[in-house]
């Protein structure tokens, strides 16, 4: 019997509970603010502030994960801070308070991601990472389905404030899960990506040279930046578009947009973990990048609330694959360097530039030219991401990238 089975079970449950916590209100933020009289571009601006804060925090967050052993504490404190910021927004949804809440959520979200990746790698090691990443993502998406279903029902009967209460409950459950993961099951040297022969040695300093010295990592970061510049605004924009036409209940429709995508993500993540274990991550990323422009075209052309079905099914494919492929690809590229978490943080920082700008860009276009034009712009960016990846990607240069990183950091 695997002596770490208990910790792995609680790690899965942790991913389930964090699904409703780590991103704050997520797509519910847009419809919540619209209910308080906010314009589409103002919503985009405040969401962009949160994205910028997260972008600036991701590389230090990766360095923190590489450096500290108290990864469980980092995740726990982050969960509490996200809920506190969201409850503050419920009390006073003015611009200053909303901006502060989103900045805090962005920073905490940047920290939780690498911390969970570090915990996972520290428990299962490189050999077990692809399959466990798939399980992590499947549990995370299942948690999103559960939370969105409950949030939609609660919001329908008691209004959007019920969503805030649900988030607080899930945060408490996350703390319980963290407390049941045994510290002794976490190898903190392996969690950083050190080779066994280097484990226990002098800690290496995490640095931006990790990104600059590896062409595969730079390519991955560029593709992800364009992907998120297109993707980040699509779900909030879909919800705002439907609500603005008066054809849908805000809480219920937003919940449905989440549920449809997450139901697709669960099997996608499980299959992606198994596929990556045998074939690697290149094809998974390619398929994810292909799904995004298709999603944007459907959303822009089909002016109906029912568009959420194909649009969010395609979102489930893209997000389900990347949730497994991105951390797995970074871990494989940087294996043995001792800088996996800072590498993941660096890639996340670059992609966050796109994610931070996406809501503001889409909000401005939607206000002045309509929602169809906004979806067209996002679709064009998605096609550019696919072109860049197809033009530059090389399947088998991970080893060369890892060697360049190790040499640069000696």
Question: How should each PLM-predicted stretch be described?
Answer:
Residues 73-87, 283-297:
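Structural signature of the two symmetry-related core transmembrane helices
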Residues 16, 85, 97-111, 307-321:
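Hydrophobic core of transmembrane alpha-helices in multi-pass small-molecule transporters
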Residues 39-49, 247-263, 339-342:
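Loop-to-transmembrane helix entry
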Residues 2-51, 218-219, 228-245:
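Helix-loop boundary and gating motifs at the non-cytosolic
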Residues 1-5, 185-220, 405-410:
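Juxtamembrane intracellular "pre-TM" segments in multi-pass secondary transporters
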Residues 163-179, 375-390:
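Symmetry-related core transmembrane helices of the 12-TM Major Facilitator Superfamily/SLC fold
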Residues 57-70, 268-280:
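Helix-to-loop junctions at the C-terminal end of transmembrane segments
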Residues 103-142:
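Cytoplasmic helix-loop-helix junction between adjacent transmembrane helices
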